[in-house]
Swiss-Prot record:
Belongs to the class-II aminoacyl-tRNA synthetase family. It comes from Helicobacter pylori (strain J99 / ATCC 700824). This is Alanine--tRNA ligase. GO terms for cellular component: cytosol. The keyword Thylakoid does not apply. It catalyses: tRNA(Ala) + L-alanine + ATP = L-alanyl-tRNA(Ala) + AMP + diphosphate. It comes from the Bacteria. Binds 1 zinc ion per subunit. Zn(2+) binds at residues 554, 558, 656, 660. Catalyzes the attachment of alanine to tRNA(Ala) in a two-step reaction: alanine is first activated by ATP to form Ala-AMP and then transferred to the acceptor end of tRNA(Ala). Also edits incorrectly charged Ser-tRNA(Ala) and Gly-tRNA(Ala) via its editing domain. One of its GO terms (biological process) is negative regulation of DNA-templated transcription.
Length: 847
């Protein structure tokens, strides 16, 4: 049975609108990932946005529960039901039907469509929900209905937000399979398995814990697809179902092991984590040191460790990820389109971790022999595994699990000191929606006229302080927000900064517009008051001249993305952007740095479109029609049914609500000024056009003239070559080897800094001079510290030593056991690096 299609078809026949799965990265600052089907409907439930014309919805939503409040990562592989990524089937009512219909629909689908026997079904309800009990008694004997408290049967998304009592459908998997003392209905055992949760959304909980009735009672339900699939196939573990069979076969082929072996938990971890990695990478979450990217990194590294347990010492997960992409490509087409990029990025991240995995495992296994009688693992060692070898703390705890041990958390936290809690770094901060509820109830969305004009006459509907509390009057020197009846000011969005400008009253400057933002469909402008203004005042709103320069950079960004896709391939997609009056910044998915030839091609393509003077065209059309025309869209963006499409003839077509030039000739010229990496799999281009392009060219010409003067040569290249030759000749002079040499237990130890010379050559000379050697030499050059280290006839690995020291300098190293090099940009930490290098060597020699 195709459960997904069966579910959606059932509810479509019941008058529900079918919604696609929203991105795993939600447009919600309070959530790390989309963790439930109701996330995309949250603003409807709270009344922030109006309910849709069809007040019934159903979806099959991809969800992630790893990191943040809802975190199942540590349980995956050890239980029958936990997953990091799973699919949640759900039906929703926005003030339409309530408990009676929700219960009726659920019972019909479970018993008729899925075919579960009524005698095997049990129901839980909230202890105060007598109404639900009476409704269930129509289908289920009262002795199979159990009342439970808030802990089990009151659902809420977070500490605040929509919530309400819930009712759950359980299935008895059979007494013959479960003999534990907790295997009774309501117990902690697995015999009675929850399959569907019906939430009766009646309240909203405020930040201070107060429950308030929602505008209209609603329904939110959730049923795990993986769980239902296993039950229909009479499997007691989700991982034993046909959904996971292709992955288990691939893992078995890679390892040479049987799924039904002692390594079964590791099979399950790898299979689960491969799904999460595939979908997150395909949805443009990239490996990073913080936030969602760090959660992704933790998932991958946990999978690699379980692969290591099964004897896999080389990159392998990318192959399993490839199977995931193929398996789900018929439902999620983007997996097929991005398969090559996803596998490549996964492979490269695996290679990075495998460089340190072996050394980290050696340290871990050695430390296990020193466990105290309470089986507490040294927090300092756990921190070293985390900081030096890249082992996330939960990975170390996972490894300790089979030994009945755990990390000394106090010791770990002491070592961590006040480092940023990485897994929350990119999603902290909450918008207090309650503050806007009153505004949204009082004001309709204001009219934006900025596409047609940069100036208009408008009434000031209201003024608001920094907390968006309404004020009656705005006085000179205050900074306040204004809501205009209609506005020419474009609100920040699509990477473009918000418009600035001026408000005039009675032909006098009344306020400077510092910024413009959109909150829940209302365009607010931030003002610096020059002359007193009050609610109802009529003003002239005028956009500043920098609007045109912003438009130039915005249009250039569209041309840039098109050029990148032509030069690098269709896998390129936007990962972020910033559009200002003097520059643009564009982040995009690509696995490696662009070379000079590629950058030149991209720049030439953009300028070619500028010189063609292509006319811009703006159209409004249904979303599906726009996609059929080939319009580029942001994966993470949630679009309305009808969208605005901006095109420059054959050169570019994108979904965009921003301001653009009328024809590309107005852009003037385009120059790439920098290409860099943002994170694994994400590159960044910074560029200028328009006036900024002219100013850059002017400054470069001035510098060129100065260079000719300093070199005393009109041929700058020839002058530079002559200077380089002179420097090269001066460097050939022998460099003093005044490096301190200490003899420790018969080993010559050298730790020092030089001002000039080839430090690799110095290491070679030291190795030829001494029979037993530990040497590390630092050199400051080009605002960086570089280092080289050599080992001779001493049981210490140079690459591990160099890498550990490089961490303090903000870098990393690599090389062989007998020679390694490294570098970092944190020059101020040079003395600390010297101290660490020496202490590490001394500790090794004395140990």
């Amino acid at each position: 049975m195709d459960i997904r299609n069966e579910f959606l078809q059932f509810f479509q026949n019941k008058g529900h609108e079918i919604y696609p799965s929203m991105p795993l990265v939600p447009n919600d600052a309070t959530l790390l990932f989309t963790n439930a089907g109701m996330v995309q409907f949250k603003d409807i439930f709270t009344g922030i946005v109006p309910r849709p014309s069809i007040p019934r919805a159903a979806s099959s939503q991809l969800c992630m529960r790893a990191g943040g409040k809802h975190n199942d990562l540590e349980n995956v592989g050890y239980t029958a039901r936990h997953h990091t990524l799973f699919e949640m089937l759900g039906n929703f009512s926005f003030g339409d039907y309530f408990k009676e219909e929700a219960i009726l629909f659920a019972w019909e689908f479970v018993t008729k469509n899925l075919g579960f026997k009524p005698k095997d079904l049990y129901i839980s309800v909230h202890e105060k929900d007598d109404e639900a009990v009476k409704l269930w008694e129509k289908f289920v004997p009262v002795d199979r209905i159990k009342k439970m408290g808030d802990k089990d049967n009151f659902w809420q998304m977070g500490d605040s937000g929509p919530c309400g009592p819930c009712s759950e459908i359980y299935i008895d998997q059979g007494e013959k399979h479960f003999k534990g003392s907790e295997d009774y209905f309501g117990g902690e055992g697995d015999r009675f398995l929850e399959i569907w949760n019906l939430v009766f959304m009646q309240y909203e909980r405020s930040n201070d814990g107060v429950l308030s009735p929602l505008p209209k009672p609603s329904i939110d339900t959730g049923m795990g697809l993986e769980r239902v699939q296993a039950l229909l196939e009479h499997k007691l573990n989700n991982f034993d179902s046909s959904l996971f069979a292709p992955l288990m076969e691939e893992i078995s082929e890679l390892t040479g092991l049987d799924y039904a072996s002692e390594f079964q938990p590791s099979f399950r971890v790898v299979a689960d984590h491969a799904r999460a990695v595939a979908f997150l990478l395909a949805q443009e979450v990239h490996f990073n040191k913080e936030g969602r990217g760090y959660v992704l990194r933790r998932i991958l590294r946990r999978a690699l460790r379980h692969g290591y347990l099964m004897g896999l010492k080389e990159a392998f997960l990318y192959k399993v990820v490839g199977v995931v992409c193929e398996q789900f490509s018929n439902v999620h087409a983007y997996l097929k389109e991005s398969k090559e990029m996803v596998m490549k990025e996964c492979f490269e991240e695996e290679e990075r971790f495998l460089e340190t995995l072996e050394s980290g495992m050696e340290l871990f296994n050695l430390s296990l022999t020193h466990l105290n009688e309470n089986k507490i693992f040294d927090g300092k060692i756990a921190f070293k595994l985390y900081d030096t070898f890249g082992f996330p703390l939960d990975l170390t705890n996972d490894m300790l699990r089979s030994h009945g041990a755990c990390v000394d958390m106090q010791g770990f936290e002491n070592c961590m000191q006040e480092q940023v809690k990485r897994s929350k770094a990119s999603w902290k901060g909450k918008q207090n929606n309650a503050d806007f509820s009153a505004i949204l109830n009082a004001y309709a969305p204001n009219e934006f006229v900025g596409y047609e004009t940069t100036e208009c006459l408008a009434n000031a509907l209201g003024f608001f302080d920094s907390d968006f509390k309404e004020i009656t009057e705005a006085n000179p020197n205050q900074e306040v927000w204004v809501l205009l009846e209609k506005t020419p000011f474009y609100a920040e969005g699509g990477g473009a900064i918000g418009d600035r400008g001026t408000l005039f009253k009675d032909n006098e400057e009344a306020a400077l517009v510092l910024d413009t933002k959109n909150f829940f469909g209302l365009n607010f402008s931030l003002l610096e008051i020059k002359k007193a203004l009050k609610k109802g005042d009529q003003v002239i709103a005028q956009v500043s001249d920098e609007r045109l320069e912003i438009a130039k950079h915005h249009s250039a960004t569209h041309l840039l993305q098109s050029a990148l896709r032509e030069v690098l391939g269709s896998h390129v997609s936007q990962a972020g952007s910033l559009v200002e009056s003097k520059r643009l910044r564009f982040d995009f998915s690509h696995a490696k740095a662009l070379n000079d030839e590629e950058l030149e091609k991209v720049e030439d393509l953009v300028n070619a479109q500028i010189f063609k003077h292509l006319t811009s065209q703006v159209e409004h059309m249904p979303l599906n029609q726009a996609k059929d025309k080939g319009a580029l869209a942001l994966f993470s963006e949630k679009y309305a049914e009808n969208v605005r499409v901006v095109s420059f003839k054959e050169a570019s077509i994108e979904l965009c609500g921003g301001i653009h030039v009328e024809n590309t000739g107005l852009i003037g010229g385009f120059r790439i000024v920098k290409e860099s990496g943002v994170s694994s799999g994400v590159r960044r281009i910074e560029a200028v056009c328009g006036k900024a392009f002219y100013q850059l060219t002017k400054e470069e010409n001035k510098e060129l003239k100065n260079a000719k003067t300093l070199l005393k040569n009109n041929d700058v290249i020839a002058g530079i070559n002559k200077l380089k030759e002179s420097v090269k000749n001066s460097q050939k002079a022998p460099v003093s080897m005044d490096l301190p040499v200490e003899k420790i237990h018969g080993v010559n130890l050298v730790v020092g800094v030089v001002e000039q010379g080839d430090i690799k050559e110095m290491i070679d000379r030291l190795k030829s001079k001494h029979e037993k050697l530990l040497a590390i030499v630092f050199k400051k050059e080009n605002e960086r510290i570089t280092l080289a280290c050599g080992v001779k006839n001493v049981p210490i690995k140079a690459n591990a030593w160099a890498n550990e020291v490089a961490q303090i300098l903000g870098g990393k190293g690599g090389g062989r056991d007998d020679f390694a090099s490294a570098g970092g940009k944190d020059i101020e930490n040079l003395q600390a690096a010297l101290n660490l290098a020496k202490n590490t060597a001394l500790k090794a020699l004395e140990g």
